A protein has these predicted regions:
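Cysteine-centered metal-binding/redox modules
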Residues: 33-164
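Single-pass alpha-helical membrane anchors
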Residues: 2-26
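Membrane-engaging insertion elements
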Residues: 24-36
Length: 164
């Protein structure tokens, strides 16, 4: 084997080892989560209440996101949402985080979010890959996308890969 090939192989192996066992920078978006003998990263907001709250608050305030309704009986929110989507209030109310393509309730994400109660009378919490915070299935936002929720680890890892 040529010396260049050995160097390339060594760099690849070093990169793989560094990825799984290396030190993370202070601004890393992920923390480690052990799953069946392997190490997989959990999104940092699932483990960091301050970061999660900051991201959620930004999603509430951002004109282009408008995460809500904070009070599920807030009629004005759903009227605004329906107007934004050019649809009826009834249709807008059916487009929730719980059926959004970015709403992750996979088994591994439930383990990542294992702090506190994940379910209440209105629904359950999941992780929003679009806006990087734990969101509630009964709420919605302007960036809702058809096709969810994420219910398998494989799809969850795919979203994570695209978000790095």
């Amino acid at each position: 084997m040529a010396n260049n090939s050995k160097i390339i192989i060594a760099v690849i192996i070093s990169g793989i080892i560094g990825f799984f066992f290396g030190k993370k920078s202070k601004d890393s978006n992920f923390s480690n989560f052990s799953d069946g003998g392997g190490v997989f990263p959990c999104p940092e907001p699932t483990k960091n209440l301050e970061l999660n709250t900051r991201n959620r608050d930004k999603a509430i305030k951002a004109d282009w996101i408008q995460y809500g309704a904070l009070n599920l009986s807030d009629k004005a929110y759903y009227i605004r949402l329906a107007k934004h989507w050019n649809t009826s209030v009834a249709v807008a109310k059916k487009s929730t985080c719980g059926n959004c393509a970015a709403f992750d309730v996979s088994p591994r994400m439930k383990k990542c979010m294992s702090v506190g109660e994940l379910q209440d009378k209105d629904g359950a919490f999941g992780y929003c890959w679009m806006h990087k915070f734990k969101c509630h299935s009964a709420r919605t936002c302007y960036t809702w996308a058809k096709g969810g929720a994420i219910t398998t680890d494989k799809v969850s890892y795919g979203w994570q890969e695209r978000n790095q």
